Amino acid sequence: KLKEIEPQLKFNSFEQKSLNQENKFKTLTIPSLNIFSIENPIININSSAIVKNGKIYYERINTNERFNEGNIKYHNKTYAVADIFFDEIIEEGFFLGGNGCWNWYHYLIEILPKTLLLEETNCKTILISDDISNYPTMKQALEALINEKHYTIKLLNRKQNFKVKKLFFINEINKIEFNKLDSNIKNLDTGYHRENYLYNLRNKLINKYIEDNKSQEKKIFLWRENTHKIAKNQNDIL
């Protein structure tokens, strides 16, 4: 561990409120927030897991979380099968990937906030998914948060693994359960958010791309295409 940013915290996680029923909650413990300097791990930019010396390191929100992405092919609650072959050796890098790195929600909520701690390291190379080349707004969001003149942006393919001689890695600032091993299990410990990081992220993006705050819309509708998860009234809104 290179540096502890925040200590372990506790908070109450509430389930969805139902009529005529008491709103249940569960007290959760958030792991401390740390910056790690790791030598010679094997990474895949589409996985939040780190592989080193035959072991997988992954911060689960609960034991029912499924995280077989990137080079993690299969796992249960104890063991995992991982692809440990790598395509390239990288000298040094700040890890800006993770489960769902191609997904705007995970990218915005879980991955981008880590740029706010980039200056806590001396690393000048950022490792990020090459998906930002396909989605201009993803790249623009990154540009709003860092000064590209000071850093080298190394784009990594999700289908490839890499060995990094010195990896700077931040554990989860904000965490959302990626998927479930057993979808029938309904649990309350499915995520947490550190709101101060989200506020800082929001302010940086607004200051970069919105000149007149008075012109901001109160509500924003996200148009989803090429997916089955489309709002029923989408055509009416468009």
Question: Where do the PLM segments sit?
Answer:
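The feature primarily captures lumenal catalytic ectodomains
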Residues: 1-238
